[in-house]
Curated annotation (Swiss-Prot):
Name of the protein described by the UniProt record: Glycine--tRNA ligase beta subunit
Transcription regulation as UniProt keyword: no
Gene Ontology molecular function: arginine-tRNA ligase activity; ATP binding; glycine-tRNA ligase activity
Xref: HAMAP family: Gly_tRNA_synth_beta
Catalysis: reaction(s): tRNA(Gly) + glycine + ATP = glycyl-tRNA(Gly) + AMP + diphosphate
Its EC number(s): 6.1.1.14
Family per record: Belongs to the class-II aminoacyl-tRNA synthetase family.
PANTHER family from the UniProt entry: GLYCINE--TRNA LIGASE, CHLOROPLASTIC_MITOCHONDRIAL 2, GLYCYL-TRNA SYNTHETASE
Compartments, as annotated in UniProt: Cytoplasm
Keywords, ordered alphabetically: Aminoacyl-tRNA synthetase, ATP-binding, Cytoplasm, Ligase, Nucleotide-binding, Protein biosynthesis
Annotated organism of origin: Streptococcus pneumoniae serotype 19F (strain G54)
Domain of life, source organism: Bacteria
Pfam families reported for this sequence: DALR_1, tRNA_synt_2f
Amino acid sequence: MTKNLLVELGLEELPAYVVTPSEKQLGEKMAAFLKENRLSFEAIQTFSTPRRLAVRVTGLSDKQSDLTEDFKGPAKKIALDSDGNFTKAAQGFVRGKGLTVEDIEFREIKGEEYVYVTKEEVGQAVEAIVPGVVDVLKSLTFPVSMHWAGNSFEYIRPVHTLTVLLDEQEFDLDFLDIKGSRVSRGHRFLGKETKIQSALSYEEDLRKQFVIADPCEREQMIVDQIKEIEAKHGVRIEIDADLLNEVLNLVEYPTAFMGSFDAKYLEVPEEVLVTSMKEHQRYFVVRDQDGKLLPNFISVRNGNAERLKNVIKGNEKVLVARLEDGEFFWREDQKLVISDLVEKLNNVTFHEKIGSLREHMIRTGQITVLLAEKAGLSVDETVDLARAAAIYKFDLLTGMVGEFDELQGIMGEKYTLLAGETPAVAAAIREHYMPTSAEGELPESKVGAVLAIADKLDTILSFFSVGLIPSGSNDPYALRRATQGVVRILDAFGWHIAMDELIDSLYALKFDSLTYENKAEVMDFIKARVDKMMGSTPKDIKEAVLAGSNFVVADMLEAASALVEVSKEEDFKPSVESLSRAFNLAEKAEGVATVDSALFENDQEKALAEAVETLVLSGPASQQLKQLFALSPVIDAFFENTMVMAEDQAVRQNRLAILSQLTKKAAKFACFNQINTK
């Protein structure tokens, strides 16, 4: 017979961003707890609101499965003394298992007998295991925790209630400073305390108290209500997924409504209005059928439709205050002079160990000069790049960005266009922040892409130079994200810029403000990001490509993909083994690898030398790999008919030189001796 288990923890208001991860974590840890305790179940459903985390297990076994375990002990010769009595070693072994020497049997393994005991454990009733759910709750981890009421323990928020029910059976358990009961709390304003009758009545018992415990149901309620408003007013409402997830974790009983604001605020840039609504007020944006922003918004109330008009007025009043700020800054910022703001950046600290933002911009500008040539920018693009690099951080000192920091770069674009700068300069100022996340949008323009790379490279090199290098998961200055951005942009634009050569060029630059240091660490850091971009590529293939001599990001990613693509083909293993053997022997070559045809002693030497001399890797990675694999028969014939490590030193070095020249060319693709063919 199966049972149903409910565990609910009632807390003070949780931060919206921790609700969903905590709910998921609770479900995963409950499943692990049940598995560890040999309790089978049909399904686990999790619940969450801003004031509760809960999990319900249905189809739960009414008892643990029985356990039979065999334990291997010492060898028989150690377990028995000369008189055939059990030694202390044998006695200690069985005692540790809760058994006696009478339980010992001997089993033969590979010609030798060993002590074995079998331990049988009868499964306990589920009621005996349920109290362990308290440990599951204690094991939950959170990004932040707090103390309260002078207690020594800490948790994400103060705990108010604990409910643990096995069907209708209530468990009186203690958790932190709370004693368990079947009492749960309803909606803070509309509901009251209520008793959960059974594990299966949980949602309905709370629904009567204006709490929708299932987040999926709350989400659907919000979406349906928004769609209803759309249909009623003939508008389009942007249901942003992240905003929706945040809003549903701010309410226990959602009611969506539409408010409005004065159309005069539409003269302010749309980005300012959208930021005010979405980021600051958690409102959904409303547009007409053509996508034009309307002077309306959608908000979601934590409650029902009672006195909704008052709620709408309150939300409108709060939003207008934000929009007034935006309108004021938009008007006042246009009076500022860009060159004056750039000069003031001399007094803004980039980092206390690195210097000012202006110094950061100057270094970035010098990097853009190198990159412009390597990226093949036109004369006009180079001019636009130079101008953008000279001013691109100015908007950090505007009133708008000071109030709405999410708009940095965006407002820079707006203000530069108003000041008469070219669209390319303006776009680059916006795009230099991209990407803002691991999978974020990339720059579209070449000028913006180069400025983004240059800005990120100086950031990375500057922090590394003063010893602020990420370690473990600690990366307070987001240098991994910056490096990932550099790698992604280079790959997206297909620029054949060798990162090792570029970094060498950067370290050769001279600045008054800073000297770049720790080049080796920077190179390893960049390679680690390329490694990450290779995703699920097998580790040995990643290592082979990363160990190669070609550090053009696009080429490396293409090479890894090509190797994975052919790794299941018949000729992959023998071809890689041939090249790998060449790589291993080539390491023994001394000095400059020059080949003297006069020292050839067989046709196979000559054939390989000629094949290497004419080898020019070209085309896509798949084609280059075919070129290399085509050498496999020639390499094999060479090894079958040639003693590479000949006694004659000149002959030996000549043969190693052939292999050295081969591997030098092949290494532009990958170091094949890093690939595992076993």
